[in-house]
Regions:
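Short beta-strand/loop motif that positions the catalytic acidic residue
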Residues: 272, 278-280, 284
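Short alpha-helix in the alpha/beta-hydrolase fold that links the catalytic acid
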Residues: 274, 288-297
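Acidic catalytic loop of the alpha/beta-hydrolase fold
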Residues: 253, 283-287
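Alpha/beta-hydrolase-fold enzymes
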Residues: 107, 111, 126-240
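Short, surface-exposed "cap/lid" segments of acyl-processing enzymes
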Residues: 4, 11-13, 17-82
Length: 339
């Protein structure tokens, strides 16, 4: 972690580590209210960056919104892969780590199904898991999750299609997080800068004697530093899993074609029948809506909902729109489906 951010606190909602395997940890957040919905919620974050964007600070926390509405909430922390993890595959993550974590959640809760909330590429893992283990998934919520990668609406898609991923993985083994971060920044540098600094610019007009405004200004700066910390915290990527994801999804578009294979099993999105909530950000510069919208027609779920919010890729988790509309929609959608 870069030294300037070492003292910046993030992810402060109390939790306990209830399972770990290799670098992966399963975090169980402590409840904030007595009345709990029976079905536990398991947030599956992406490999890129860190899970605590879902709990950046108390007033910008998807996790706290879930807890305050009575949801028993867990999240996966993928940790920081090292050289001995270079050969991990998507099968290791889905049928290994995720499956073991869900078994532990079911053991602790006494409930035989969980609600999955998949975030970005963690949503792809959640889709794959729901196909392979439908008996363990009560509800499926995905945020900013791509399924149709055949689009030129994002530079990320264009670059990934032309990437020599074999050369990259064969050379590095573990794809460096710093390299990933540079690539993601240059997908849309102007929007990324605006998103990062907007919270600070909102408070630069304080009068010297306006104590309340100056306190808010200080909190805006702290929010900015937390975002900087998160944006600089980039784990490396297990080479073989990264190779498979880039080739199968971005370059061959196998997921939406129902031709992706995990451990000898075909991933057919039509096998998804549980209730589905598909959420996306209108101004997402990484995962264009055109990549996420086809999911609802690709699954067999009779109970399925789609929502698009006027925010960006990160704003959907920490922005004003997230706290005002996105989180309430998730919790209200889940309540009648969590018993």
């Amino acid at each position: 972690m870069p030294e300037p951010y070492a003292g910046i606190s993030v992810g402060t909602t109390p939790f306990e580590i209830v399972y770990s395997e290799n670098k992966m940890r399963l975090l169980h957040y402590l409840p904030t209210v007595k009345k709990q919905h029976p079905v536990p919620v398991f947030i599956v974050y992406a490999f890129v960056n860190r899970y605590y964007i879902m709990d950046l600070q108390p007033d910008k926390s998807v996790v706290r919104k879930l807890l305050d509405e009575g949801f028993d909430t867990y999240i996966v922390d993928w940790g920081y892969p090292s050289g001995d993890d270079r050969h991990l595959t998507l099968n290791d993550y889905v049928n290994g780590y995720l499956n073991s974590a869900i078994d532990r959640i079911m053991e602790l809760s006494g409930i035989d199904k969980v609600t999955l909330i998949g975030v970005c590429h963690g949503g792809v893992l959640s889709l794959i898991y729901s196909v392979l283990h439908p008996e363990k998934v009560k509800n499926l919520v995905v945020l900013n999750t791509p399924v149709n990668f055949d689009t030129d609406k994002s530079l990320l898609n264009i670059w990934s299609k032309s990437m020599d991923v074999d050369r990259l993985v064969d050379y590095y083994g573990i794809v460096p997080g710093e390299l990933m971060n540079i690539g993601y920044f240059f997908v849309d540098p102007l929007r990324n800068i605006i998103d990062l600094y907007s919270g600070v610019y909102d408070r630069v007009d304080c009068e010297p004697d306006d104590i309340k405004c100056r306190r808010q200004d200080g909190e805006s700066v702290r929010t900015f530093l937390r975002m900087m910390k998160w944006g600089s915290d980039n784990p490396g990527q297990a080479g073989e899993a990264y190779r498979q994801f880039i080739k199968d999804c971005y370059q061959k578009n196998l997921l939406i074609k129902n031709e992706m294979e995990i451990d000898g099993q075909m991933i057919n999105l039509k096998d998804i029948t549980m209730p589905l909530l598909n959420i996306m950000a209108k101004y997402d510069n990484f995962i264009p809506n055109e990549s996420s919208i086809p999911l609802n027609d690709a699954v067999s779920s009779a109970d399925k909902t789609m929502a698009i919010f006027p925010t960006g890729h990160i704003g959907i988790f920490v922005g004003y729109e997230s706290q005002k509309d996105v989180c309430p929609m998730i919790t209200e959608w889940l309540k009648p489906r969590s018993f």
